[in-house]
């Protein structure tokens, strides 16, 4: 068992030492076709295909042309890495057992009928189906499908050192962010076996005592924390975000750009197998499809965000979001380990490994999420006050020959009863799906828990967004490349629309720690003032 104070380096040393024991390394040859038989699953996939066709039979191709981006590199995704196994994997990367898939198919069919009944004003089991929105990520066998006694795991000898490190980072992340215990396998009959001898990145979903050994594949191209944390989340019991039964409230599905025999991958999971714990749909979840997943026209998305400002947020491979972490904590009943709950603010929740403090949404810090999160440098980040007159903000984060993650966190505040308008003037960055390497994230909603509007593509220039409330946390981040953004901001009354008036403030520059910031009030606050 891992000490709660164990750092990743200490954890790595502990596991590597355990790896020297023979029982921790497997040389058994295992491939996906040894686990699943296409002949058994194809009939069920066909049923789901018909279900999707029926549900979206009247749909028209729907997407905003402004969401077609000129990506700097060919988009990658777990689904694309698993193209070889499209005929056997569910939703691109889940090795679902016949029994589990049968339950999903039956639940999906019954739920579709229930929705039709609801439209006629009927009730389901004596209750309105509207209640399903308040349910959680679990199936009929819960809690038998979670690893209540901890997760034993072992490596296959085929795993590369890079793959092992990426897996251990994911294990350590889910240990640190939840109450789940992990330990290298000794003689446990139920355990996770990570393999690297097969193609692709795929996993089973949840604990299945009937399988005993459950396989997680981290093949060539999958050796990235965003991928390993995603696959391990499946093994711990989490489905894809876009499988939620309430997804149509957040994204539009375009079936006309998906090959007919792949439509089953867009079936929604019913409340019998999936629950949401009342948490919001998170387009920025690491468990969400990329916009163009399974599209036969690469430039046209299969999934389009209803709020088009969230389109670039979809498909990130950075790692689990705050909502992903919150769902996992709820799924494993972690907060029950604390006799009292911490007074968390801004959407935070009690940290089960230290019940006196909170886990905080991105952009917030402090014991109770009452403060702004810290930035990578003392020369960036802080509070900005919005005024009726327009102010301008410019920032450039540069990477040296040795790249490292750099994030500057700001909160824009306006008086009570006002809203904040941000006019993005220019973005200079590498444009990729999900904007997870370098970009700007604006949290314009009152609910700070989901990932906000992310922008990293030059096409986002001249875009205006308006907040729901009087505070906007925003993050400017660079992980691999230089990033630069310029925008103007001001406040308006809650009933006002966009205002195009411009009134530039003095331009000030701070070039310490590779950060260049322009904002009069900010630089006066940190006591660094130099006329450009």
From Swiss-Prot:
Disulphide bond pairs: 179-334, 201-222, 338-358, 360-369, 380-408, 435-456
Q: Where is the Peptidase M12A domain?
A: 135-335
List positions binding Zn(2+).
Answer: 230, 234, 240
PROSITE patterns cross-referenced by the UniProt entry: ASTACIN, CUB, EGF_1, EGF_2, ZINC_PROTEASE
Q: Where is the active site?
A: 231
Q: Its domain of life?
A: Eukaryota
Q: What is its main location?
A: secreted
The residues of the propeptide are 23-134
Domain EGF-like, by residue range, is 330-370
EC number(s) from the headed UniProt entry: 3.4.24.-
CUB domain segment(s): 380-494
What is the top EC class of this enzyme, as a single word? Answer: hydrolase
How are cofactors bound according to the entry's free-text note? Binds 1 zinc ion per subunit.
The places in or outside the cell where this protein is found are: Secreted
Signal peptide (UniProt feature, chain positions)? 1-22
State the Gene Ontology BP annotations: molting cycle, collagen and cuticulin-based cuticle; proteolysis
PANTHER family in UniProt: DISCOIDIN, CUB, EGF, LAMININ , AND ZINC METALLOPROTEASE DOMAIN CONTAINING, ZINC METALLOPROTEINASE NAS-29
Functional note: Metalloprotease.
Specify the protein name.
Answer: Zinc metalloproteinase nas-29
Gene name, per UniProt, is nas-29
């Amino acid at each position: 068992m891992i000490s709660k104070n164990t750092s990743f380096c200490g954890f790595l040393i502990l596991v590597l030492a355990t790896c020297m024991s023979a029982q921790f390394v497997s040389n058994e040859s295992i491939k996906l076709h040894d686990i699943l038989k296409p002949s058994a699953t194809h009939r069920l996939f066909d049923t789901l295909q018909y279900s999707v066709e029926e549900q979206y039979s009247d749909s028209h191709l729907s997407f905003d042309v402004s969401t077609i981006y000129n990506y700097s590199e060919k988009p990658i995704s777990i689904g694309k890495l698993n193209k070889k196994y499209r005929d056997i994997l569910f939703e691109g990367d889940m090795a679902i057992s016949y029994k589990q898939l049968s339950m999903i198919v039956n639940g999906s069919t019954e739920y579709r009928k229930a929705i039709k009944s609801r439209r006629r004003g009927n009730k389901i089991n004596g209750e309105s189906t509207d209640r399903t929105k308040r349910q959680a990520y679990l199936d009929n066998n819960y809690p038998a499908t979670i690893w209540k006694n901890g997760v034993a795991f072992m490596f296959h000898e085929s795993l590369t050192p890079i793959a092992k490190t990426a897996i251990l980072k994911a294990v350590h992340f889910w240990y640190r962010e939840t109450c789940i215990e992990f330990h290298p396998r000794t003689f446990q009959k139920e355990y996770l076996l990570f393999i690297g001898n097969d193609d692709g990145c795929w996993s089973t979903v949840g604990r299945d005592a009937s399988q005993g050994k459950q396989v997680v594949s981290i093949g060539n191209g999958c050796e990235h924390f965003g991928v390993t944390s995603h696959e391990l989340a499946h093994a711990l019991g989490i489905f894809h975000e876009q499988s939620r039964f309430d997804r149509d409230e957040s994204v539009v599905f375009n079936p006309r750009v998906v090959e007919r025999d792949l439509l089953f991958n867009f079936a929604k999971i019913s409340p019998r197998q999936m629950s949401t714990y009342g948490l919001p749909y998170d387009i920025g979840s690491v468990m969400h499809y990329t916009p163009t997943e399974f599209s036969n026209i690469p430039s046209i998305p299969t999934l389009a965000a209803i709020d088009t400002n969230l389109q670039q947020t979809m498909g990130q491979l950075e790692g689990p979001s705050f909502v992903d972490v919150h769902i996992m904590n709820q799924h494993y009943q972690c907060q029950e380990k604390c006799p009292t709950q911490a007074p968390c603010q801004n959407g935070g929740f009690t940290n089960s490994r230290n019940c006196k403090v909170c886990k905080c949404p991105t952009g917030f810090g402090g014991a109770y999420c009452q403060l702004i999160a810290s930035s990578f440098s003392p020369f960036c980040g802080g509070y900005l006050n919005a005024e009726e007159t327009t102010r301008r903000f410019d920032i450039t984060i540069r990477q040296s020959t040795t790249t490292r993650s750099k994030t500057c966190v700001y909160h824009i505040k306006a008086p009570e009863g006002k809203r904040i308008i941000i006019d993005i003037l220019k973005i200079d960055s590498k444009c990729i799906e999900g904007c997870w390497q370098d970009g700007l994230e604006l949290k314009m909603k009152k609910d700070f828990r989901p990932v906000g509007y992310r922008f990293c593509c030059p096409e986002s220039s001249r875009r205006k967004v308006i907040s729901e409330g009087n505070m906007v946390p925003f993050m400017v981040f660079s992980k691999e490349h230089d990033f630069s953004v310029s925008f103007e901001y001001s406040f308006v009354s809650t009933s006002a629309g966009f205002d195009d008036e411009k009134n530039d403030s003095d331009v000030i520059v701070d070039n310490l720690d590779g950060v260049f910031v322009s904002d009069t009030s900010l630089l006066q606050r940190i006591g660094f003032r130099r006329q450009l």
